[in-house]
């Protein structure tokens, strides 16, 4: 089966900061005064892991450069708009796009402002016409040693925006360093707020981490 011939695709696992169209990265860099002294092929390599990569930490490094470009409301709205437009052109009818609001606050935005900017990009494309792509947003909490309060805010923002663009919360990041068990209370809180949950597990810590 040739996937290119299908026009009813669904994608349930997309990271906004890991799925940007190449032209979006180039345009954002130009707008922000960043000179990309590399070919398109070199830029794609900078943003992508090689085939067969099995190192989660190598995957995570590929998010670093896009994140530097995604620190303003305008940039975030554009990223979501451009990604959904590209997916729609590929025949995707429904997708769930995830990102960590706390990673986009380096220039002073609150997590709520980050979410509102991404939602603006979503609503500029999704559901505009009956045949338009439909999409949901998943808000990622991050594994780490000093961001417990930020994760709590993410869960509370998910509750605020649930059913209005946001459909779930997630846990992402360096699994081997920060086991899932450490976040039991956080996701008990999400359950208390009746927020659907998905968790990255088994990527670096084996099958036992999935059972956790």
Annotate each PLM feature.
Residues 1-195, 204-211:
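Metal-cofactor-binding active-site regions of metalloenzymes
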Residues 201:
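Cytosolic ligand/metal-binding cores
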């Amino acid at each position: 089966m040739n996937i290119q011939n299908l026009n009813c695709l669904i994608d349930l696992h997309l990271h906004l900061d890991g799925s940007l169209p190449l032209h979006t990265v180039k345009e954002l860099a130009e707008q922000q005064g960043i000179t990309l002294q590399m070919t398109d092929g070199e830029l794609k390599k900078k943003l992508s892991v090689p085939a067969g990569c099995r190192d989660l930490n190598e995957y995570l490094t590929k998010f670093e450069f896009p994140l530097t470009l995604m620190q303003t409301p305008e940039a975030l709205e554009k990223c979501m708009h451009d990604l959904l437009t590209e997916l729609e052109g590929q025949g995707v009818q429904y997708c769930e796009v995830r990102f960590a609001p706390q990673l986009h606050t380096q220039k002073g935005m609150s997590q709520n402002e980050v979410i509102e900017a991404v939602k603006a990009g979503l609503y500029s494309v999704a559901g505009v016409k009956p045949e338009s792509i439909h999409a949901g947003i998943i808000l990622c909490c991050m594994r780490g040693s000093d961001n417990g309060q930020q994760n709590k805010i993410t869960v509370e923002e998910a509750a605020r925006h649930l059913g209005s663009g946001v459909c779930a919360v997630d846990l992402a990041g360096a699994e081997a360093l920060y086991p899932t068990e450490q976040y039991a209370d956080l996701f008990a809180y999400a359950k208390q707020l009746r927020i659907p949950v998905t968790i990255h597990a088994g990527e670096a810590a084996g099958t036992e981490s999935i059972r956790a």
